[in-house]
């Protein structure tokens, strides 16, 4: 089993560690400083406050005939263009996106895309990965065939995740799942951009209340249009009263979980999150016309 991780950021590096330690033939595609760091030092990561190292193959160019069983990538359109002529059959996309999967398949060919989303977060500081998987009950690694069907390759992916001890879930409609995910993460990230002191945004009652209102609005619209939410627990944003939702949000932003899985990404990728904000709000605005 050969697996290529396209992109050596926090998420790619964490999955590379887990897959390599589980015994899979794992390669990372990297560029720039990260490429140099991995080539010179190996993949350094923190586990239980101890710095460890995994030696892993690193490449900065992919041959067309260099075939992998699965390719995981998160830098979407650049990656798809580079992977277009490669002969590997399975490309697992792990990105926040509102685009249709047909648009992706128009680049690499029909039947190669297996949409997914990671359940992880953390940071890389001084070339050392400090990251962890999201608790299963909050957000496991999520995936589905575009058709929603269970196939040989989804079963193969399940076995990989089980062997690597990566929590996972297979859903029926990945596009609906991603719409609901964006309906949640866009307001959560927006909160940090609405205050002068993002690290302590959980103490800002007005921002917390506005975030609760935005979440409630998003999921009201999503449910009206889709007639379902995925995962089912997203209904909590529709059902809970604003004061209770505000209280829960405040506690979440103040927590270690909030810092690791929400704050770090929102602060390090504001351009990405603001673009997703624009895309998501334009998308649901069309439903209201």
What are these regions (language model features)?
Residues 130-144, 193-203, 256-268:
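Helix-loop-beta segment of a Rossmann-like dinucleotide-binding subdomain
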Residues 12, 150, 154, 207-215, ...:
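Generic structural signal for well-ordered, non-membrane alpha-helical segments
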Residues 3, 25-26, 91, 113, ...:
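Hydrophobic anchor at the start of a short beta-strand
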Residues 216-289:
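NAD(P)-dependent Rossmann-like dehydrogenase/reductase catalytic/cofactor-binding core
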Residues 98-179:
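Rossmann-fold dinucleotide-binding core
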Residues 1-51:
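NAD(P)+-binding Rossmann beta1-loop-alpha1 motif at the extreme N-terminus of oxidoreductases
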Residues 175-202, 206-219:
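Active-site-proximal catalytic alpha-helix in oxidoreductases
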Residues 50-130:
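Rossmann-like NAD(P)(H) cofactor-binding subdomain of soluble oxidoreductases
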């Amino acid at each position: 089993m050969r697996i290529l991780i396209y992109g050596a950021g926090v998420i790619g590096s964490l999955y590379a560690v887990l897959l390599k330690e589980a015994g899979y033939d794992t390669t990372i595609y990297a560029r720039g400083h990260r490429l140099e760091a991995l080539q010179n030092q190996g993949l350094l990561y923190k586990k239980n406050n101890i710095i460890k190292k995994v030696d892993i193959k690193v490449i900065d160019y992919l041959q067309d005939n260099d075939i992998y069983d699965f390719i995981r990538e998160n830098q979407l359109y650049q990656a798809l263009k580079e992977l277009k002529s490669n002969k590997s059959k399975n490309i697992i996309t792990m990105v926040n996106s509102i685009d249709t999967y047909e648009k992706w398949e128009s680049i690499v060919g029909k039947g190669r895309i297996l949409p997914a989303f990671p359940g992880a977060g953390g940071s890389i500081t001084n070339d050392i990965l400090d990251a962890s998987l999201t608790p299963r009950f909050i957000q496991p690694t999520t995936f589905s065939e575009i058709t929603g069907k269970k196939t040989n390759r989804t079963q193969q992916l399940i076995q990989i995740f089980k062997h690597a001890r990566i929590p996972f879930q297979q859903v029926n409609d990945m596009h609906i799942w991603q719409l609901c995910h964006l309906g949640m993460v866009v307001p959560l990230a927006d909160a940090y951009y609405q205050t002068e002191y993002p690290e302590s945004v959980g103490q800002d009652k007005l921002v917390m209340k506005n975030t609760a209102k935005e979440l409630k609005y998003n999921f009201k619209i999503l449910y009206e249009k889709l007639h379902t939410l995925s995962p089912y627990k997203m209904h909590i944003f529709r059902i809970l009263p604003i004061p209770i939702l505000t209280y829960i949000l405040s506690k979440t932003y103040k927590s270690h979980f909030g810092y690791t899985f929400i704050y770090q990404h929102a602060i390090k990728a504001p351009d990405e999150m603001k673009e997703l904000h624009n895309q998501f709000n334009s998308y649901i605005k069309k439903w209201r016309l």
